[in-house]
């Protein structure tokens, strides 16, 4: 048995450079552990730079652990992240926190920059609200500025609303009259920067090239001629200068679209493209996409930095608190681990691409295929069975498996696919 174990250890795929691992909270933390111990480490010999982003440890380290994990990601280029709690008042009370810590994803994104791409995992037997979407559609949301950093206010009487720009170089100020209020109303001033728009553009082009999918970018430049026009111009300029050759090589394309045309086109399409959205559009449309594809349990999320080299992969869903409460009472749950598994596979696949490690890429792709084929063979968790039969009609072990049985099924299917049985 020892010889067999040693031979098994020798068979593991060697990974030259480390991967940053960010642990999380509640039900996803429990599933994360299983994925790592049972699906990843038996097959992959990788050095994991471990950071515990579970809420108790964030509180204990005054959130320094989150900052450290982001800096480590800058250093090693690849991170995989478990879902984490973003505390509200109730959580501050529950965990007796020193303060209401900010969203770890926000902190990490502020340090790394980059764009979040949400991509659905498609299983043929899971019905979609938009049945025509047979290929994935990925949204890249520009998570900076616009309405989210705006200054807005209520006007309570007649008066003039002006915007003033005062140049730093001492040249004369410019001002624009926005509106002459005859009575009360509302006003807003917002901004974005060339640097942020350029970083967004690079991330989107890089991601489209990785996927070998066409890229569309949507704005309302007919109405916001200067503001949205700037987005359009920067994207076009960067595309022609840096990416056109690669796009031509892979027979993919980049096009700007008006947001209203784009929304209609997306609904009619069969998928298979990347959609670059401004901040507000991305916020709204990514939820439409998640719903249209059927399940947040089948949605991955990847933060891609403008250098095209640095990424952080995670599931697009939360920590599944409701299931965790059941788990704490000692009851079995049926929690979907697929998006968390894909966080690992996306991270490892990227590590493989950076290191030129074909075996690692093949392993990641095999595990993804095994997940999809397992569901397509009829073995699945309750959320997916509910998509097919309706949640009120599904029965344990007839239509769905509990979490550990489903993970065990994936494990044995993976071992079989890798010829390890």
UniProtKB/Swiss-Prot annotation:
What is its cofactor? Mg(2+); Mn(2+)
Kindly list the positions at which N6-succinyllysine occurs in this protein. Answer: 49, 75, 135, 149, 162, 225, 251, 353
MF GO annotations: isocitrate dehydrogenase (NADP+) activity; magnesium ion binding; NAD binding
Where is NADP(+) annotated to bind?
84-86, 91, 268, 318-323, 336
Tell me the GO BP annotations in alphabetical order: 2-oxoglutarate metabolic process; glyoxylate cycle; isocitrate metabolic process; NADP metabolic process; tricarboxylic acid cycle
Key words, A-Z: Acetylation, Glyoxylate bypass, Magnesium, Manganese, Metal-binding, Mitochondrion, NADP, Oxidoreductase, Transit peptide, Tricarboxylic acid cycle
> Which Enzyme Commission number(s) are listed?
1.1.1.42
For this UniProt entry, what is the primary localization, expressed as one broad class?
mitochondrion
Q: How is it modified after translation?
A: Acetylation at Lys-382 dramatically reduces catalytic activity. Deacetylated by SIRT3.
Q: Which NCBIfam families match?
A: nadp_idh_euk (TIGR00127), PRK08299.1 (NF006156)
User: What's this protein's name?
Assistant: Isocitrate dehydrogenase [NADP], mitochondrial
Q: What is the source species?
A: Sus scrofa
Lineage of the source organism? Eukaryota, Metazoa, Chordata, Craniata, Vertebrata
In the UniProt record, the gene name given for this protein reads IDH2
């Amino acid at each position: 048995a020892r010889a067999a174990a040693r031979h098994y250890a020798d068979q593991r795929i060697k990974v030259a450079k480390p991967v940053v691992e960010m642990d999380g909270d509640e039900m996803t933390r429990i599933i994360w552990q299983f994925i790592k111990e049972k699906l990843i480490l038996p097959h992959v010999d990788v050095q994991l730079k471990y950071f515990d982003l579970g809420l108790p440890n964030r509180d204990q380290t005054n959130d320094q652990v989150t900052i450290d994990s982001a800096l480590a990601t800058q250093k090693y280029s690849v991170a995989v992240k478990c879902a984490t709690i973003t505390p509200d008042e109730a959580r501050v009370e529950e965990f007796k926190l020193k303060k209401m810590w900010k969203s770890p994803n926000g902190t990490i994104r502020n340090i790394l920059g980059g764009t979040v791409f949400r991509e659905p995992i498609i299983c043929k037997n899971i019905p979609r609200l938009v049945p025509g979407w047979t290929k994935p559609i990925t949204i890249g949301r520009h998570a900076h500025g616009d309405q989210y950093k705006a200054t807005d206010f209520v006007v309570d009487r007649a008066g003039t609303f002006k915007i003033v720009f005062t140049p730093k170089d001492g040249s004369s100020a410019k001002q624009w009259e926005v509106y002459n209020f005859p009575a009360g109303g509302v006003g807003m001033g917002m901004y974005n920067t060339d640097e942020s728009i350029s970083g967004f553009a690079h991330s989107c082009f890089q991601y489209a090239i990785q996927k070998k999918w066409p890229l569309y970018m949507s704005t309302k430049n007919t109405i916001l001629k200067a503001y949205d026009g700037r987005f359009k111009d920067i994207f076009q300029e960067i595309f022609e200068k840096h990416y056109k050759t690669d796009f031509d090589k892979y027979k993919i394309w980049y096009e700007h679209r008006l947001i209203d045309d784009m929304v209609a086109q997306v609904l009619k399409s069969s998928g298979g493209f990347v959609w670059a959205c401004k901040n507000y559009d991305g916020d709204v449309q990514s939820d439409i996409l998640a719903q249209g594809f059927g399940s947040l349990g089948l949605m991955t999320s990847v933060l891609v930095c403008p250098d095209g080299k640095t990424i952080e992969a995670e599931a697009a869903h939360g920590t599944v608190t409701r299931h965790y409460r059941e788990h704490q009472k000692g009851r079995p749950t049926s929690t979907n681990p697929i998006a968390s598994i894909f966080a690992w596979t996306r991270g490892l696949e990227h590590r493989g691409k950076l290191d030129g490690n074909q075996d690692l890429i093949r392993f990641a792709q095999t595990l993804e295929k095994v997940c999809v084929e397992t569901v397509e063979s009829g073995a699945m968790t309750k959320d997916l069975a509910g998509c097919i039969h309706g949640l009120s009609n599904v029965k344990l072990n007839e239509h769905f498996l509990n979490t550990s049985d489903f993970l065990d099924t994936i494990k044995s299917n993976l071992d079989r696919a890798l010829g390890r049985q």
